[in-house]
Regions:
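Long, low-complexity, mixed-charge
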Residues: 1-261
Length: 261
């Protein structure tokens, strides 16, 4: 069995019951004594030495170690699992604990029943379920279900093909003098020139968490092309073009074209 995280297993012998502990490999995680104690207590073991268990875990390095936890032969028990969910309810992990000597592995039906008990209804990772038919990793959080995040909506985008923020600067004449009366407040435009292009909004798509609850997407900002005289709007409502030669300006979101310079 391939593994990285440290794990433990109950071994039942003729002279009593033992706990086998296996060291982590590479960058695997060490066992948390609280997890081991909680498991043993849930299985009905009492009277074992927590200090001895702690010392055993501290000594655990490259080879597995064994500690006796009871002088009696425990009744065999099957593999078990717990379900752990993320705070955002978008992912669920399954954490397996090995069967004792003589115990059985969980079946696919039992694993699915465990998910159902925890009300995990959406996003079960079938490739993981398939792998669990032949492979086990213990004391390790294995992703078993994932929610679907909402697809963000996108706002309408309007692109203008002229200077929408002209600078009110005086015009410099050929002789070097300055004409303060001729301020450049307009942009010249020719007949047929594109003035503005609209990219429609994308409504996005709602998501769903592992409990089957819909997650709404954000609301997009929807805009339309606004325009005055001397301008043509395309049939699909996405393009403005000038009908005349003149000046173009943008005022309060509306495009205006004047046929006089």
């Amino acid at each position: 069995m391939k593994y990285k995280n440290s794990f433990f297993k109950i071994r039942i012998k003729e002279d009593g019951t033992y706990l086998d502990v296996f060291p982590p490999k590479e960058d695997g995680k060490r066992l948390d004594i609280r997890e081991v104690v909680s498991f043993l207590e849930q299985k009905g073991f009492a009277g074992f030495s927590i200090d001895a268990l702690r010392k055993t875990l501290d000594l655990l390095q490259e080879k597995p170690l064994q500690i006796k936890i009871s002088d009696t032969c425990a009744k065999a028990f099957d593999e078990s699992a717990t379900i752990i969910t993320g705070k955002d309810n978008m992912i669920a992990y399954i954490r397996f604990y090995p069967p004792s000597t003589g115990g059985k592995l969980m079946t696919e039906r039992e694993i699915r029943a465990e998910l159902e008990r925890e009300k995990i209804l959406y996003g079960i990772l079938e490739p993981v379920m398939e792998k669990l038919k032949t492979t086990r990793t213990y004391c390790t959080n294995i992703p078993i279900a994932k929610g679907m995040a909402p697809m963000p909506a996108k706002d309408t985008v309007i692109e203008y093909f002229f200077n929408t923020k002209p600078l009110a600067k005086p015009k410099v004449l050929e002789d070097g003098s300055v004409d303060f009366h001729a301020l450049n407040l307009f942009s010249a435009v020719n007949e047929g020139d594109k003035l503005a292009k609209l990219t429609p909004h994308d409504p996005g798509k709602p998501g769903m968490n592992i409990y089957g609850k819909t997650i709404p997407q954000n609301r997009p900002k929807i805009r339309k092309l606004k325009y005055g005289r001397n301008i043509t709007l395309s049939e699909d409502g996405t393009l403005l073009t000038s009908n005349v030669n003149g000046n173009v300006t943008l005022a309060e979101g509306t495009v205006f074209v004047s046929d006089t310079y």
